[in-house]
Design a protein with these regions (language model features):
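Short beta-strand and beta-hairpin "edge-sheet" elements
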Residues: 37-38, 84-119, 211-216
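Short coil-to-beta transition motif at edge beta-strands of beta-rich domains
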Residues: 74-88
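Short, flexible loop/turn elements at secondary-structure junctions
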Residues: 66-70, 89, 100-103, 121-123, ...
């Protein structure tokens, strides 16, 4: 994919932190970036907070509110992986995700119009991708290899740097679970050889570990909320 920067915005929050927003679009041609004017409530990041604390995957979403006098049609798409955004705080990645598929349709009659742009995090967006074999055919692979493989399908710019696992369990006397648990990846295909989507594969791993997977910053975390009060260390 050839993602190119199309919009950016920078501002200070109430604590004087510098917030940078960048929006990219997959395009075969050359695009010129423009600056967006954000509203006072520019960014809202929401994490799933339902009653099921032990849910295997907890996703997040983001809303970016902008003011414009123009029709920003290139911010709208019917595809789930054509546009993504990054939000940084003081130069460090805070959140990234892909736009919610939608079509542009509105009339512009006022001087400034408020547009609310919706994005889903990288874990939620994995549902748009089907699992593929690591080695072009079925093989025994580690959980870590599976996770890195499915993330690489969506994260072409390698924004996700780390995978952390809560030191709640051990295998072979080590907390490095992901490199010591293996599976035949044929299990991610049905009898008709139809692949599961990558989000379901990640959920399978989280369930097997007995942990909850979530995304934050440049990392993915697996956490056992049962004993997080007693153990709060992680293996990278």
């Amino acid at each position: 994919m050839g993602y190119q920067l199309i919009y950016n915005s920078s501002f200070k929050d109430i604590d004087e932190n510098t917030i940078n927003i960048e929006i990219y679009r997959d395009s075969g041609g050359t695009l010129i970036a423009s600056e967006l004017l954000c509203s006072a409530d520019a960014v809202s990041i929401n994490y799933e907070s339902d009653d099921d604390v032990f849910k295997p995957i907890k996703c997040s979403d983001c809303q970016i509110n902008v003011l414009t006098t123009k029709v920003l049609a290139n911010l709208y798409t019917a595809l789930g992986n054509q546009i993504y955004c990054t939000i940084s705080k003081n130069g460090s990645l805070l959140w990234c995700g892909y736009s919610v598929p939608c079509l542009y349709s509105t009339d512009y009659n006022e001087e400034y119009n408020l547009l609310s742009l919706q994005f889903n995090d990288i874990l939620s967006s994995l549902s748009n991708y089907n699992y593929t074999y690591l080695n072009e055919k079925q093989s025994i692979v580690s959980f870590y290899q599976v996770i890195k493989h499915i993330i690489s399908q969506i994260d072409s710019n390698r924004l996700i740097k780390n995978v952390y696992v809560h030191n709640a369990k051990k295998i072979n006397d080590t907390t490095d679970l992901l490199n010591n648990l293996f599976i035949l990846d044929r299990n991610f295909f049905d009898e008709a050889n139809e692949a599961e989507n990558c989000k379901d594969v990640l959920e399978y791993i989280a369930r097997y570990l007995g942990m909850t997977c979530y995304y934050y910053g440049d990392s993915i975390y697996f956490v056992d909320y049962d004993i997080i009060k007693n153990i709060n260390s992680y293996t990278k």
